[in-house]
Amino acid sequence: MDKLNFIKTEFPKLLQNLNPEAKGEWGVMKGQQMVEHMTDSVSQATGKNNQKLHTTPDLVGRYKDFAMSDKEFKPNTPNALLSDLPSPITKATIKDAIAEYNYQITAFINYFETNRGAIITNPFFGDFNFEEWTHLLHKHAIHHSKQFRLL
């Protein structure tokens, strides 16, 4: 599967069928909250919402190995940067949220085309280049697609 094509084209198509109030198979996010959460992850990959590394140096290599593997995120994988309650939605509609996701994916691709060789720190997994971010964003999109029964 072409991971970049999935996050750029296929995932947004899947989102078109998502009810903004849908409850996932696990977790507390609703449909639109998940879309906005994914958008935040994509914008982080371009250095926006930049976070320092939260993983201790002795663990970052092992964490990155997991991120680069084909092992899926487990349901309810904790995220130390998020509260136990989902963030309130910021877009008026799920269509607006999907449009923002699409905008951020394009910005992600353009950023790395303009800044070839750029490295952006992921707060859990360390320094990532374009290919590594693409792999992680794909893994993340698959995780939430399964959570909301889109796959």
Predicted regions and their residues:
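Hydrophobic packing residues in well-ordered alpha-helices of helical domains and bundles
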Residues: 8, 94, 98-101, 134-137
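Non-transmembrane alpha-helical segments in soluble domains
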Residues: 12-15, 35, 39-43, 98, ...
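Short, contiguous alpha-helical
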Residues: 19-72, 119-151
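An N-terminal domain-cap segment
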Residues: 1-28
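General secondary-structure edge motif
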Residues: 14-18, 81, 113, 117, ...
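Globin-like tetrapyrrole-binding proteins
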Residues: 2, 15-16, 83-93, 129, ...
